[in-house]
UniProtKB/Swiss-Prot annotation:
This is Small ribosomal subunit protein uS17c. GO terms for biological process: translation. Gene3D superfamilies: Nucleic acid-binding proteins. Transmembrane segments: none annotated. PANTHER family: 40S RIBOSOMAL PROTEIN S11 FAMILY MEMBER, SMALL RIBOSOMAL SUBUNIT PROTEIN US17C. It holds the Pfam family Ribosomal_S17. Belongs to the universal ribosomal protein uS17 family. Its main location: plastid.
Length: 134
């Protein structure tokens, strides 16, 4: 009967839930980093004839269902190319975005070149190569 009259322990039960929405609003206002639920994919442009659209072929290694040998599987994705930058043969990275059309949910961006990483690794150590010493 304390619950209806407002006396005693009954009010203390409600004091805790009333304070919890305040803490929830504080946590929601914090700036959270963007969630990257999917890894970026890298592939080769195989068709660039459409306007602002490129077809990208992504190759991945997956185990064979029966023999478990890792085999190459290819899949084509339609990607958005807003500036029509890419041509057939370019290596691009696919970033997951909101759906742009029925089949386009990826954005094509230039892939970081692999050759520059290898060349820069020796310079990062600060030790000149033999060819640079002579």
């Amino acid at each position: 009967h304390h619950f209806f009259t407002g006396n005693g322990i009954g009010l203390n039960r409600f004091s805790n839930p009333i304070s919890s929405p305040q803490t929830q609003t504080q946590t929601r206002s914090l700036p959270f980093p963007a969630i990257k639920a999917m890894k970026t994919m890298e592939g080769k442009v195989v068709c660039a004839s459409g306007n602002k659209t490129v077809a990208v072929e992504v190759t991945r290694l997956a185990p064979h269902p029966k023999y478990q040998k890792r085999i190459r599987l290819k899949k084509k994705y339609q990607a958005h190319d807003p500036e029509n930058d890419f041509k057939v043969g370019d290596i691009v990275q696919l970033l997951k975005t909101r759906p742009i059309s029925k089949k386009k949910t990826f954005l094509a961006v230039p892939a970081p070149s692999r050759k520059s990483k290898k060349a820069g690794s020796s310079g990062e150590l600060g030790i000149p190569l033999q060819s640079q010493q002579e």
